[in-house]
């Protein structure tokens, strides 16, 4: 059976939200608007995102509304009860997460720390949100002397364990993380990811190694990616995507170093012949700029992404569809360091389409997954609606 688009390239600009969601107040996020606040005062233009119609979704600084947008455009609000990366991505692929992952801005509960200490026979130090490099600078020497576990978190629902490779061998650190992963599946903790963070070096000159290992949770149901894989389509995960879904529904995983490397890897994939989807997460917006409330850096990162779009577009095949979206907000002028509950922008375009218009909004990110499933004639997810008819695409 032929499909309207042979390939779909899905790009998630991690945290690039487009205004407070209808239920933002319930998340203490009233007034949040990542794109607007990031671009206020920015003295450069975003010509390629403007041409696609980003400024048609919502009035934005720097990005004007255009008469003839180069993409279908809309915005979606989140149905799931959460505003983290895993929840947003899982919803994009058709799930509705009713029990949110937990974040720990004041560190983990004493009860959990005690359980970790009893289970491992090692004392826990730190137990606070911290930058991974800063925490080993602060406690790395102590850890080497004592063999304690450096346990810390971030603004995401993660528990990270740092240890010097000469003091706690990798196998032991991995074993500890596996056991902590089991502990934290308990609904009272519900931590999205446990991460082994080994490091080497001497006091004053520690470096984290590439032996990091993530212990994620599998999605709580069958995603559109699973359905595509089951139907022998390619699902190429680029960047954080493989980790976010714990490998579920992935046929090939490609690691990335940063946003620009992510775009390089995507363009390499686009040049190859395959049948299915590529799925890229660009994490720098969130990790380097949103959480750090670095408005200028965030705006420049959007500019850098904008500059890569012509190269992507030049390499597309006639029957490719590109979808650009986000997974939550992370307003750089909001209080604290957490994500913000926002609408996500959606831009969809293909070389085979020359006329575009606004699409109706929806109250779930799953409409992205539903559109992809519909395109490939596979089972649609329980949530979301396909946009193919609104796009005027015969299928």
UniProtKB/Swiss-Prot annotation:
<dbReference type="Pfam" id="PF01676">
    <property type="entry name" value="Metalloenzyme"/>
</dbReference>
<dbReference type="GO" id="GO:0043094">
    <property type="term" value="P:metabolic compound salvage"/>
</dbReference>
<feature type="binding site">
    <location>
        <position position="328"/>
    </location>
    <ligand>
        <name>Mn(2+) 1</name>
    </ligand>
</feature>
<dbReference type="GO" id="GO:0006015">
    <property type="term" value="P:5-phosphoribose 1-diphosphate biosynthetic process"/>
</dbReference>
<dbReference type="GO" id="GO:0005829">
    <property type="term" value="C:cytosol"/>
</dbReference>
<comment type="pathway">
    <text>Carbohydrate degradation; 2-deoxy-D-ribose 1-phosphate degradation; D-glyceraldehyde 3-phosphate and acetaldehyde from 2-deoxy-alpha-D-ribose 1-phosphate: step 1/2.</text>
</comment>
<feature type="binding site">
    <location>
        <position position="339"/>
    </location>
    <ligand>
        <name>Mn(2+) 2</name>
    </ligand>
</feature>
<keyword id="KW-0413">Isomerase</keyword>
<dbReference type="GO" id="GO:0006018">
    <property type="term" value="P:2-deoxyribose 1-phosphate catabolic process"/>
</dbReference>
<feature type="binding site">
    <location>
        <position position="327"/>
    </location>
    <ligand>
        <name>Mn(2+) 1</name>
    </ligand>
</feature>
<keyword id="KW-0464">Manganese</keyword>
<dbReference type="InterPro" id="IPR024052">
    <property type="entry name" value="Phosphopentomutase_DeoB_cap_sf"/>
</dbReference>
<comment type="function">
    <text>Isomerase that catalyzes the conversion of deoxy-ribose 1-phosphate (dRib-1-P) and ribose 1-phosphate (Rib-1-P) to deoxy-ribose 5-phosphate (dRib-5-P) and ribose 5-phosphate (Rib-5-P), respectively.</text>
</comment>
<dbReference type="GO" id="GO:0009117">
    <property type="term" value="P:nucleotide metabolic process"/>
</dbReference>
<feature type="binding site">
    <location>
        <position position="291"/>
    </location>
    <ligand>
        <name>Mn(2+) 2</name>
    </ligand>
</feature>
<keyword id="KW-0963">Cytoplasm</keyword>
<comment type="similarity">
    <text>Belongs to the phosphopentomutase family.</text>
</comment>
<protein>
    <recommendedName>
        <fullName>Phosphopentomutase</fullName>
        <ecNumber>5.4.2.7</ecNumber>
    </recommendedName>
</protein>
<dbReference type="GO" id="GO:0008973">
    <property type="term" value="F:phosphopentomutase activity"/>
</dbReference>
<dbReference type="InterPro" id="IPR017850">
    <property type="entry name" value="Alkaline_phosphatase_core_sf"/>
</dbReference>
<dbReference type="InterPro" id="IPR006124">
    <property type="entry name" value="Metalloenzyme"/>
</dbReference>
<dbReference type="GO" id="GO:0000287">
    <property type="term" value="F:magnesium ion binding"/>
</dbReference>
<feature type="binding site">
    <location>
        <position position="286"/>
    </location>
    <ligand>
        <name>Mn(2+) 2</name>
    </ligand>
</feature>
<dbReference type="GO" id="GO:0030145">
    <property type="term" value="F:manganese ion binding"/>
</dbReference>
<keyword id="KW-0479">Metal-binding</keyword>
<dbReference type="InterPro" id="IPR010045">
    <property type="entry name" value="DeoB"/>
</dbReference>
<feature type="binding site">
    <location>
        <position position="14"/>
    </location>
    <ligand>
        <name>Mn(2+) 1</name>
    </ligand>
</feature>
């Amino acid at each position: 059976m032929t499909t309207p688009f042979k390939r779909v390239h899905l790009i998630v600009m991690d945290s690039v939200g487009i205004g407070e969601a209808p239920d933002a107040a319930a998340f203490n996020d009233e007034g949040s608007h990542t794109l607007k606040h990031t671009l206020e005062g920015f003295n450069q233009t975003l010509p390629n995102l403007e041409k696609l119609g980003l400024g048609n979704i919502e009035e934005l600084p720097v990005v004007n509304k255009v008469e003839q947008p180069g993409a279908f455009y809309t915005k979606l609000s989140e149905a799931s009860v959460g505003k983290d990366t895993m929840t947003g991505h899982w919803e994009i692929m058709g799930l509705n997460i009713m029990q949110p992952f937990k974040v720990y801005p004041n560190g983990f509960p004493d009860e959990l720390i005690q359980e970790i200490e009893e289970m491992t026979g090692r004392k826990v130090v730190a137990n606070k949100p911290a930058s991974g490099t800063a925490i080993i600078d602060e406690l790395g020497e102590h850890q080497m002397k004592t063999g304690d576990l450096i346990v810390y978190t971030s603004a995401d629902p993660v528990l990270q364990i740092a240890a010097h490779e000469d003091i706690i061998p990798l196998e032991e650190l991995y074993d500890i993380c596996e056991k902590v992963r089991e502990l934290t599946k308990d609904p009272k903790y519900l931590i999205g990811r446990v991460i082994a963070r080994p490091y080497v070096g001497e006091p004053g000159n520690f470096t984290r190694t590439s032996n990091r290992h993530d212990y994620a949770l599998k999605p709580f149901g069958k995603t559109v990616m699973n359905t595509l894989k089951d139907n022998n389509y390619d699902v190429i995960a680029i960047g954080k995507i493989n980790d976010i879904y714990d490998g579920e529904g992935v046929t090939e995983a490609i690691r990335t170093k940063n946003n620009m490397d992510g775009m390089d890897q995507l363009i390499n994939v686009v040049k190859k012949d395959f049948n299915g989807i590529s799925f890229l997460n660009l994490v720098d917006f969130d990790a380097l700029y949103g959480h750090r409330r670095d408005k200028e850096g965030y705006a420049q990162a959007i500019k850098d992404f904008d500059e890569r779009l012509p190269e992507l577009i030049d390499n597309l095949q006639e029957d490719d569809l590109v979808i650009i979206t986000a997974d939550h907000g992370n307003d750089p002028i909001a209080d604290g360091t957490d994500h913000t509950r926002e609408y996500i922008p959606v831009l969809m375009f293909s070389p085979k389409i020359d006329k575009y218009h606004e699409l109706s909004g929806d109250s779930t990110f799953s409409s992205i997954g539903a559109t992809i499933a519909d395109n490939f004639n596979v089972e649609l997810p329980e949530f979301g609606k396909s946009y193919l008819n609104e796009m005027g695409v015969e299928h």
